[in-house]
Curated annotation (Swiss-Prot):
Reactions the enzyme catalyzes: L-citrulline + L-aspartate + ATP = 2-(N(omega)-L-arginino)succinate + AMP + diphosphate + H(+)
Protein name per the record: Argininosuccinate synthase
Pathway(s) this gene product operates in, as recorded in its UniProt entry: Amino-acid biosynthesis; L-arginine biosynthesis; L-arginine from L-ornithine and carbamoyl phosphate: step 2/3
Entry keyword annotation includes Amino-acid biosynthesis: yes
Annotated GO CC locations: cytoplasm
Amino acid sequence: MAKVHKDVKKIVLAYSGGLDTSIILKWLKNEYGCEVIAFSADLGQGDELAPIRDKAFATGADKVYIDDLKEEFVRDFVFPMFRANAIYEGHYLLGTSIARPLIAKRQMEIAKIEGADAVSHGATGKGNDQVRFELAYYHFDPAITVVVPWREWKLNSRQALVNYAKKNGIPIPVTKKRPWSSDRNMLHISFEGGILEDTWAEPPENMYVLTKAPEKAPNKPQFVEIEFKNGNAVAVDGEKMSPAQLLAHLNYIGGEHGIGRVDLLENRSVGMKSRGVYETPGGTILREAHSAVEQITMDREVMRIRDSLIPEYARQVYSGYWFSPEREMLQTLIDDSQKCVNGVARVKLYKGHCRTVGRKSETNSLFNLDFATFEKDQVFNQADATGFIKINSLRLRIRALMQGKK
């Protein structure tokens, strides 16, 4: 018999159909005895979404929302982040981190539509997602009730969840043979847990979904031209595309060439280290191309200041502060720097490697061959370097003189 929590009447659950949320849906019905609405955001999971509706109803959902948010995801979340060249700890392109604010945003919109007084998610008490979800919830409604089963129940391991699911007849796509969990959207797919908890063990090849093994990728390189306008990718090989279409196209191309695999031991927001394996084919290509166009269009000092902000911007996204005044402030500054980022980058894809081989801008190029050439020129007086170096070395020479007096 359900243990009724009289203060909670209706819950909107962020539901993926995976290990955690499949159990949570049933657990909420059993423990809270209230109406539970399952919400799944279509962020590009592909075939994973097909059984979601039936599975949710079979597990006890009173109502199910499956909303296509792919264009909004790429346009309003991924692209702003890529305008900042955000990368966490030098490797992670923040595919999971950037998805959570949008899921939470839509979840809160549904809660308002349905008159729900609570929301719930499947993030554990050890992870980053609990912070990302809940900071976003409170941005939209400071008084919302958040039900977090991982902080209440005694199912404290993946295997305990599997056993609970079997006991309750819940079909889940995880077995003892492949116990790792995954999270997929248009930007990436992530894997954690299981064999990946052995930091010395190489991830099994059958784990990867989006990318071919680099050694099995085509023996012939592929060249791709990506056009940018105000820092946003707008076309591939001359073909205009919507943000979601463009990223999907680059995902396919990159996946064929084994682009975008990352194996990272990262520092979580709560303080512990955790291993994550990621596939981000399209995002890897996009960031490389974006940086290339910046190289030819962005002023040196503007780039220096912007580059100094990348770690802070990435930390804010990783830690769940998307809807914060500090992230919005940085975004305003970054977007202003992107007004000149108009041009085309040419990248070469070959067996897991993505590198720039050309960049051009018809309207905003700062590259002037007359000044940059190593051949004879008429515009740069090399003797001017003497004064430049003397002025810039003044503090160093003074320091050396003063130390010599000691």
